[in-house]
Regions:
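Nucleotide/phosphate-binding catalytic cleft detector across ATP-hydrolyzing
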Residues: 3-142, 150-168
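Conserved Rossmann-like nucleotide-cofactor binding loop
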Residues: 145
Length: 168
């Protein structure tokens, strides 16, 4: 799922990371919940895809359009500027190429700047754990594309393992 959190407002969008695309023109027909309802129910000329697979980008152009859609949706709601700052969760252990693909897609979609945070650290912060303390905390995050296991301490990840098997 794609979650958009706005400071002071909380989570303002929580929708499936699914996009319905016309196969020949590559025109995006639906994004999010509407596109998910189309999974397995489309004619041959329309395909409902997940542009993020196993926690990484599988279709850069469609991912960019999906991010752009959510930026516009949040901007129209009056929650943020048209060129927001983005913090994006990524699986631990992704390659530099995969990180760059995420960052580039967000910039092309209109982000002013992008910071990438490993998902176990984001989960620890979201759970209210004292990640800056010299105490170890184990995080197990079973997401849609990956399962992440990590130990955090002193504001960082001490060790982590990401398995590209999860709840999807």
């Amino acid at each position: 799922n794609t979650l958009v959190h706005v400071a002071g407002k909380g989570v303002v969008i929580s929708e499936p990371s699914v996009v319905a695309v016309e196969t020949k023109s590559r025109k995006v027909l639906a994004i999010g919940a509407e596109a998910k309802r189309m999974l397995g129910r489309t004619p041959a000329n329309i395909v409902a895809i997940r542009p993020l697979r196993d926690g990484v980008i599988s279709d850069a152009a469609v991912t960019e359009q999906m991010i752009s859609y959510y930026v516009r949706k949040v901007h129209q709601g009056g929650w943020l500027s048209a060129r927001p700052r983005m913090i994006i969760g990524i699986p631990s252990g992704v390659t530099e190429v995969e990180k760059r693909a995420v960052r580039d897609a967000a910039i092309r979609a209109g982000a002013r700047w992008v910071r990438l945070v490993e998902e176990p650290m984001a989960a620890a912060i979201g759970a209210g754990l004292a990640v800056g303390e010299p105490n170890g905390s184990m995080i197990v995050d079973i997401g849609g594309g990956t399962t992440e296991v990590a130990v955090t301490s002193l504001g960082g990840i001490v060790t982590a393992r990401s398995i590209r098997i999860a709840g999807d």
